[in-house]
């Protein structure tokens, strides 16, 4: 637990700011301009025509001096809790409704005054006029949120219960201008034209968290998708009071929790965006490989895989131990999975890509990269390729060729190892069953952009297993520490959750009672993770911070136990 003052100890001391101009000056709370009919009509016109969905931005919401005093009370008297899930990383206060005690009102006089003003009948009526929304309830639902360096909130639509209007009042330091380079912008996502109630992979509007401004937008299922961009600034924090105005009456449709339900129950609306920014709906993201092969892992298979894999994992007794561990723990992590000869080639390609600036790319870098979405579930790049054929007898010489860039090398490993009958036999021995194996994919997670969120698996009669072979630049001591600290994300998180039908929001998988069921695998070069899946298991790749040493590249595949 920490206070805002402790969380932002690097920021400058606030000076007394200039008040609103005399015509708008109030007795220390909200700008009287907000209550004028002409202003409300103007803002309503802006609201109705705004894109990508209805929203408005208000400036000079409060008297500057008053807001500075409220901020000082936040810094001094309000306790913040650090919260991190697959969806966010933030310092958050309790609901500010809890300040309704004698001590709370005494210590936070201006803060409670601000809260009361925001939920007053007068201001709620003003919000109704500006947005055209139904009558709003007096229910207080707000908190203080502080996003320090690396803080973020990924794409979601805010739809829970009777929420009608979302608002954010910014209290970020007014003594140093907030710029685009600082990050922390509110990102608004348009809805895909291809897939109903699904956000496009990229936002089309970004709003900076400027001092004494307020954003309001209508909460709409499958429409109001937004995110808080990662805060890139090292010595600034994005500070806000945010919350919701609720409708007075409860409708059956109001309980729908669109983006959260997609995370919990999964969805088929996966999308990809090509380099031409054309979205493509994927009816089925998995292609099963032909599995007609002898299930016995034999000498020829071992000889073949020794050219690629660490020999320590090809011993029969070692494979038996892996099988027992997977059966007991549900997860195994194999470091130094590729042999040193192959790993050296990949390592050099990663260094080369960093040196020539292609280490962290986007879909415009190559016609072969596509962005996978939708962003309220996932965002990363997938490398599209046709299966390659070996052109040289010595595959090490071929992989080392200058014409082979990093994605080409990873593609070759995917094709020649993951798609080989020898590897499928090895997998069958480790898992202990005949398998159907999906075609592997090469992915790239870019710093400051990419992630997958926790999606609960649907119930299945067949046992399923996921494979993930990870590569990152952790070659220097500082790089290794950065990844292992977890501060820059990129790790694979593996969790046992509540029973399928009882889990209602993404954050529920992180309740304190489930903390002991959470495990993570650091983003580490040349590490294979195999996970046994079921309907009570969720996995995700944590959002990768812009300050990460490199992209995270991986090769993934899935296997299903045959009947």
Could you describe each region identified by the protein language model?
Residues 132-141, 432-442:
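Short, surface-exposed acidic
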Residues 408, 412-432, 438-455:
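C-terminal structural cap/anchor segments
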Residues 26-27, 78-80, 135, 175-180:
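Proline-centered turn/helix-capping motifs that create local helix->coil transitions or kinks
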Residues 7-17, 24-30, 35, 46-51, ...:
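PAPS-dependent sulfotransferase catalytic core
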Residues 2-20, 145, 150-151, 158-163, ...:
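Catalytic core of Fe(II)/2-oxoglutarate
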Residues 64, 121, 125, 165, ...:
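A structural signal for well-ordered alpha-helical segments within the folded catalytic domains
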Residues 68, 162-165:
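Non-catalytic, well-ordered alpha-helical scaffold segments
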Residues 35-130, 309-311, 319-426:
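Non-heme Fe(II)/2-oxoglutarate
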């Amino acid at each position: 637990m920490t206070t805002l003052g402790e969380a932002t100890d690097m920021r400058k001391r606030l000076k007394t700011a200039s008040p609103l101009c005399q015509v708008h000056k109030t007795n220390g709370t909200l700008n009287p301009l907000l209550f004028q009919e002409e202003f409300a009509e103007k803002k309503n016109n802006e609201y109705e025509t705004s894109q990508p969905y209805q929203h408005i931005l208000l400036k000079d919401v409060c008297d500057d001096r008053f807001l500075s005093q409220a901020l000082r009370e936040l810094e001094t008297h309000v306790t913040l809790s650090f919260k991190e899930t697959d969806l966010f990383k933030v310092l958050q206060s309790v609901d500010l409704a809890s300040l309704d005690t004698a001590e709370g009102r005494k210590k936070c006089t201006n803060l409670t005054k601000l809260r009361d003003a925001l939920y007053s009948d007068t201001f709620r009526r003003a919000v109704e006029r500006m947005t055209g929304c139904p009558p709003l309830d007096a229910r207080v639902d707000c908190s203080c949120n502080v996003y320090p360096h690396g803080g973020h909130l990924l794409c979601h639509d805010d739809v829970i219960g009777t929420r009608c209007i979302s608002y954010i009042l910014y209290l970020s330091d007014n003594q140093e201008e907030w710029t685009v380079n600082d990050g922390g912008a509110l990102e608004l996502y348009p809805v895909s034209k291809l897939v109903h109630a699904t956000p496009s992979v990229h936002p089309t509007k970004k709003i900076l968290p400027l001092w004494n401004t307020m954003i309001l937008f209508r909460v709409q299922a499958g429409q109001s998708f937004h995110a808080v961009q990662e805060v890139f600034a090292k010595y600034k924090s994005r500070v806000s009071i945010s919350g919701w105005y609720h409708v007075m009456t409860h409708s059956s449709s109001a309980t729908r929790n669109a983006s959260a339900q997609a995370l919990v129950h999964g969805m088929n609306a996966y999308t990809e965006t090509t380099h031409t920014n054309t979205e493509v709906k994927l009816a089925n993201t998995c292609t099963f490989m032909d599995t007609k092969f002898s299930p016995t892992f034999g000498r020829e298979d071992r000889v073949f895989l020794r050219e690629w894999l660490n020999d320590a994992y090809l011993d029969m007794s070692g494979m038996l131990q892996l099988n027992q561990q997977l059966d007991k723990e549900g997860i195994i992590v194999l470091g130094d999975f590729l042999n040193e000869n192959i790993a050296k080639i990949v390592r050099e390609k990663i260094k080369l890509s960093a040196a020539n600036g292609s280490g962290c790319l986007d879909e415009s870098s190559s016609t072969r990269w596509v962005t996978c979405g939708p962003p309220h579930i996932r965002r990363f790049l997938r490398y599209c390729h046709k299966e390659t054929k070996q052109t040289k007898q010595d595959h090490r010489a071929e992989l080392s060729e200058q014409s082979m860039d990093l994605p080409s090398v990873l593609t070759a490993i995917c094709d020649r190892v993951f798609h080989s009958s020898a590897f499928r036999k090895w997998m069958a021995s480790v898992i202990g069953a005949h398998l159907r194996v999906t075609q592997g994919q090469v992915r790239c997670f870019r710093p400051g952009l990419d992630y997958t969120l926790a999606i609960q698996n649907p119930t299945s009669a067949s046992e399923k297993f996921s494979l993930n072979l990870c590569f990152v630049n952790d070659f220097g001591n500082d790089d290794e520490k950065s990844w292992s600290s977890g501060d820059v994300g990129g790790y694979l998180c593996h969790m046992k959750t509540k029973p399928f039908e009882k889990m209602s929001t993404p954050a529920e998988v992180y309740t304190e009672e489930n903390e002991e069921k959470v495990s993570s695998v650091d983003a580490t070069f040349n590490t294979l993770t195999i996970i046994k899946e079921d309907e009570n298991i969720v996995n995700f790749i944590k959002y990768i911070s812009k300050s990460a040493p490199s992209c995270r590249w991986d090769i993934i595949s899935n296997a299903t136990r045959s009947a």
